[in-house]
């Protein structure tokens, strides 16, 4: 991940909120925000364990998530948002369907009054895995352009 050339464009009013990404873009998104004190939600699956350990090495705070422990996870994430931190999560969840927003990120944005940001990523050289999300693995030394846009604005409780 060190060899990736990431160009990040953010709005002028970019501030703490929920960093929403598609599951296929986990690697690029993680590389872009390493060492930035971001709190992320990671699946309790075996794949999630691998990703959680890697994210901790990149100085992310990790909360493991599942349908059965939802209230505990939400409390941790809400606390981070209240403390002016970013929270990251895959909008389409750990199992898809791909590119369809699950309700958790929308609810968290409304409950916290924080904006929900969307990662829009363009890759240089990469390959895709054959899975539900077509997971993208950028090749070493490739350029990645990430633009962050509003999905839901701040104070969207209406």
Please state what every model-predicted region is:
Residues 1-34, 60, 135, 139-146:
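Membrane-anchoring hydrophobic helices of lipid-metabolizing enzymes
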Residues 16-69, 112, 124-129:
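Catalytic core of membrane glycerolipid acyltransferases/transacylases, capturing the structured
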Residues 47, 51, 70-73, 77, ...:
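Amphipathic alpha-helical interface surfaces
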Residues 56-70, 74-81, 150-153:
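Extended, non-globular alpha-helical segments
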Residues 65, 90, 118-121:
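Generic beta-sheet signal
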Residues 77-108, 112:
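Catalytic-site beta-strand/loop segments enriched in glycine and acidic/polar residues
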Residues 100-157:
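A cross-family acyltransferase "interaction/gating" segment
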């Amino acid at each position: 991940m060190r060899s990736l050339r990431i160009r990040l464009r953010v709005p002028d009013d970019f501030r703490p909120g929920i960093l929403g990404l598609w599951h296929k873009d986990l690697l690029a998104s993680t590389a872009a925000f390493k060492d930035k004190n971001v709190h992320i939600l990671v699946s309790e699956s075996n794949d999630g364990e691998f990703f959680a350990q890697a994210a901790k090495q990149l100085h992310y705070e990790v909360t493991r998530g599942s349908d059965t422990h939802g209230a505990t996870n939400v409390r941790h994430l809400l606390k981070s948002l209240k403390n002016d931190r970013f929270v990251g999560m895959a909008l389409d969840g750990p199992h898809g369907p791909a590119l369809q927003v699950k309700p958790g990120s929308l609810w968290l944005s409304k409950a916290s009054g924080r904006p929900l940001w969307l990662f829009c990523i363009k890759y240089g050289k990469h390959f895709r895995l054959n899975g539900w999300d077509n997971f993208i693995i950028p090749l070493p030394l490739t350029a990645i352009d990430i633009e962050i846009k509003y999905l839901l604005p701040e104070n969207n409780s209406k």
